[in-house]
């Protein structure tokens, strides 16, 4: 295991990520600018999972042997470490297989009549035009199942939520919105959205997938009722997501999935359920992934999320400046840094996003191309696809320069220069 990182020392940080040393096609070093899709993992995370699996692997919350006890302790300590990282209490975090499942858990339970705040016919569900499909389609389905109406905040021309586009009344039962757009990079006005929702008596659901890895997040301070984030976007393993729910709400909610581990008692006629969060963690949990995610939280915490945010803002500002200086390049989202972070999505006039991505890949620069699971947002701007560069703590200014140079090459290659 490498030495711990106590400040933003890029050389030390990058040494923790072996994949960043890769030489790609054409002999070019990897410039990984796709952390908004999935991040790379430091040795500390890999080592934590490996150590658990080779020394303490066992079934959690079952039996009385030493490995079970060690596995249970590691699992619950992981929950505590992650809760500390996001400003929540330990019993307010539910582990899921990803953030999409976490959002589906909430939307499913909100359609269950056993929950006193369930959505029904005539009610209104609100989301925004800015959302990832994972925070849109579950609400479409909830509206379909319950007879509720789905409405949404629109988006301004610079990619921000248009707060004047929708009025909330007492029919609104839930307001779901992103904290940090995975396309335009905007930071949404959480306090204002929460205030409006709560004034209408609605619950709030926050998609925090793009904020938790990149800036300080305190869920209690934000005042949301529910939030979801994923492990693989914050230097952690695949196969692990987190649902945050206020304690009093989780205590009232019926389960989403049923089976082993989440019960209190079972007879042939029925069952009673364990308290939250165990009530929502049916079956064998993803123990090693929790251990790895906790290691990722500790790793980022040791660097300091304020330092992470400041570093990434410098990279985003440099990318916006560099791309804005290229004729024919249009940035989707704000071109100022006010309430803005990573990613930077863009189009090159006359060149398809996939072709831009291929030219960049030929130079070792990895970006995402497509609609980034935000098709309605792209349609709002009349676009089928964009190229998207997204940054993480391990990226460098040199990699931004390579991005800009690669976009210039794409224009020359396709005769647009």
From Swiss-Prot:
Q: What start-end ranges are recorded for coiled-coil regions in this protein?
A: none
Q: Which UniProt keywords apply?
A: Acetylation, Pyridoxal phosphate, Transferase
Name a single GO cellular component: plasma membrane
Described purpose of this protein according to its UniProt entry? Catalyzes the removal of elemental sulfur and selenium atoms from L-cysteine, L-cystine, L-selenocysteine, and L-selenocystine to produce L-alanine.
Q: Keyword Acetylation: yes or no? A: yes
Q: Which residues carry this modification: N-acetylthreonine?
A: 2
Q: Write down the species.
A: Mycobacterium tuberculosis (strain ATCC 25618 / H37Rv)
Tell me the Gene Ontology biological-process terms attached to this UniProt entry.
cysteine metabolic process
Q: Describe the reaction catalysed, as an equation.
A: (sulfur carrier)-H + L-cysteine = (sulfur carrier)-SH + L-alanine
Q: Point out residues bearing the modification N6-(pyridoxal phosphate)lysine.
A: 233
Name used for this protein in its record: Probable cysteine desulfurase
> GO MF annotations for this entry?
cysteine desulfurase activity; pyridoxal phosphate binding
For this protein, the record's InterPro entries field holds: Aminotrans_V_dom, Aminotrans_V_PyrdxlP_BS, Cys_dSase_SufS, PyrdxlP-dep_Trfase, PyrdxlP-dep_Trfase_major, PyrdxlP-dep_Trfase_small
Family (UniProt): Belongs to the class-V pyridoxal-phosphate-dependent aminotransferase family. Csd subfamily.
Q: Keyword rRNA-binding, does the record have it?
A: no
EC number from the UniProt entry: 2.8.1.7
Known Gene3D superfamilies for this protein? Aspartate Aminotransferase, domain 1, Type I PLP-dependent aspartate aminotransferase-like (Major domain)
Cite the CDD domains for this sequence. SufS_like
Q: Which cofactor does it need?
A: pyridoxal 5'-phosphate
Catalytic residue positions? 373
């Amino acid at each position: 295991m490498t030495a711990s990182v106590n400040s933003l020392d890029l050389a030390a940080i990058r040494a923790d990520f072996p994949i960043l040393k890769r030489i790609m096609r054409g002999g070019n070093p990897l410039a990984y600018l796709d952390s908004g899709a999935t991040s790379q993992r430091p040795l500390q995370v890999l080592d934590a999972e490996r150590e658990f699996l080779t020394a303490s692997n066992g079934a959690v919350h079952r039996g009385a042997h030493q490995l079970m006890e060690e596995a249970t302790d590691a699992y619950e300590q992981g929950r505590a470490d992650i809760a500390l990282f996001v400003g929540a209490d330990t019993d307010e975090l539910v582990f899921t297989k990803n953030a999409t499942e976490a959002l589906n858990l909430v939307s499913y339970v909100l359609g269950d009549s056993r929950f006193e705040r369930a959505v029904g016919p005539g009610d209104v569900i609100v989301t925004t035009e800015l959302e990832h499909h994972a925070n849109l389609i579950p609400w479409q389905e909830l509206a379909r199942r319950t007879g509720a109406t789905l409405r949404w905040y629109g988006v301004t021309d610079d990619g921000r939520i248009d707060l004047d586009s929708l009025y909330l009344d007492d029919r609104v039962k839930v307001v779901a919105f992103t904290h940090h757009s995975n396309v335009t990079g905007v930071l949404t006005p959480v306090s204002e959205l929460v205030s409006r929702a709560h004034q209408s008596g609605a619950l709030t659901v926050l998609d925090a997938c793009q904020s938790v890895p990149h800036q300080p997040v305190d869920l209690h301070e934000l005042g949301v009722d529910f939030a979801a984030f994923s492990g693989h976007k914050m230097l952690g393993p695949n196969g692990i997501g987190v649902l945050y729910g206020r304690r009093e709400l989780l205590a009232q909610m019926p389960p989403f999935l049923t089976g082993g581990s989440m019960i209190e008692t079972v007879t042939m006629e029925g069952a009673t359920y364990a308290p939250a969060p165990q009530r929502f963690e049916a079956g064998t949990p993803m123990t090693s992934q929790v251990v790895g995610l906790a290691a990722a939280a500790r790793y980022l915490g040791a660097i300091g999320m304020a330092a992470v945010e400041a570093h990434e803002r410098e990279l985003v500002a440099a990318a916006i400046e560099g791309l804005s200086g290229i004729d024919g390049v249009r940035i989707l989202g704000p071109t100022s840094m006010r309430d803005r972070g990573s990613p930077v999505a863009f189009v090159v006039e006359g060149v398809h996003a996939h072709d831009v991505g291929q030219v960049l890949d030929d130079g070792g620069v990895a970006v995402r191309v497509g609609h980034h699971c935000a098709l309605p947002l792209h349609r709002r701007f009349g676009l089928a696809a964009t190229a998207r560069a997204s940054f993480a703590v391990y990226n460098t200014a040199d990699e931004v320069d390579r991005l800009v140079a690669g976009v210039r090459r794409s224009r020359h290659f396709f005769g647009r220069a």
